[in-house]
Regions:
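A conserved C-terminal secondary-structure "cap"
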Residues: 202-268
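Secondary-structure boundary elements
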Residues: 52, 115-129, 186-191, 223-225
Length: 268
């Protein structure tokens, strides 16, 4: 046996120690959700930047099931944390958090959010927590916009300056992708922002929306001088799902036209 572990609400498995000289960092989060927009976004950045896996978090409030991989091996669902240090234009430490599931209960989501927000504050020395997720519409657009909300006016203005962004107001962001940045601000005095890519729930995955978010992140954070270096994974997916996207868009457009026709008053 490699060691004994008592299962608690959260079990942390350290893969590699984070650099000891981190002065401040930015944390980017993308948990599974509608059209997997957030997870696709963060997974693409992790891959493009060759980020290093530093930790895994196991949560007792995840769905009670394990995943079976293509080779037949069992895999326990987890949240995974990665780190990347960018040196161009000065040192910039980025942490990425994504995973297989979100907690299944309201209490679980809040406890999970607090656990990660505290880690962002105390271990990662985060000055900004960015959550990526989906903004649900009843139609699909050729060029998705990114809807921005934030815990501070200063951060909001910074992100809303990027191309193809809109202010998100008078609504809710459900789940960990909304609660983590909000809780980081409320309890740990870390600025938080939500970047929500425009999509429709008919899609199981939407790399277009994820790519739109990465374009906004790159304009704001200056991650790369060439945004296409951050999106090869998504660009390939976009090509693969093009027929699915076209079919879904046409169906939604027809449904909308029928609804508009049905709503027109009869005039004689």
């Amino acid at each position: 046996m490699k060691g004994k572990h008592e299962m608690t609400k959260f079990n942390l498995k350290t893969i590699q120690q984070t650099p000891s000289d981190i002065d401040k960092s930015i944390v980017l989060i993308g948990m599974p959700g509608i059209a997997n927009v957030g997870k696709l976004c963060i997974s693409s950045l992790i891959d493009a930047l060759s980020a290093t896996k530093v930790a895994e978090v196991f949560c007792s409030d995840f769905p009670p099931q394990v995943l079976v991989e293509p080779d037949g091996l069992l895999y326990v669902p987890r949240t995974t944390i990665y780190h990347s240090r960018l040196e161009d234009g000065g040192t910039k430490d980025l942490f990425f958090i994504t995973g297989d599931y979100q907690p299944t209960t309201s209490i679980g989501v809040y406890e999970f959010a607090d656990y990660l927000a505290k880690k962002c504050a105390e271990e990662f020395k985060a000055e900004l927590v960015i959550a990526t997720a989906a903004f649900v519409r009843d139609n699909l657009t050729e060029v998705p916009h990114v809807f921005i909300s934030s815990t501070s006016q200063e951060t909001l203005e910074l992100f809303i300056e990027a191309d193809k962004t809109e202010l998100f107001k008078n609504g809710t962001v459900t789940g960990a992708n909304g609660i983590i940045p909000a809780m980081a601000a409320a309890l740990y005095d870390i600025a938080g922002v939500c970047c929500l890519g425009e999509t429709a729930p008919v899609l199981q995955s939407d790399p277009r929306a994820a790519r739109a978010i990465i374009e906004v992140l790159n304009q704001t954070l200056h991650i790369s001088s060439d945004v296409t270096k951050l999106t090869p994974f998504l660009d390939e997916l976009i090509k693969e799902i093009e027929p699915v996207f076209r079919e879904a868009k046409n169906q939604l457009d027809m449904d909308k036209m029928r609804d508009q026709t049905r709503d027109q008053p009869y005039i004689s």
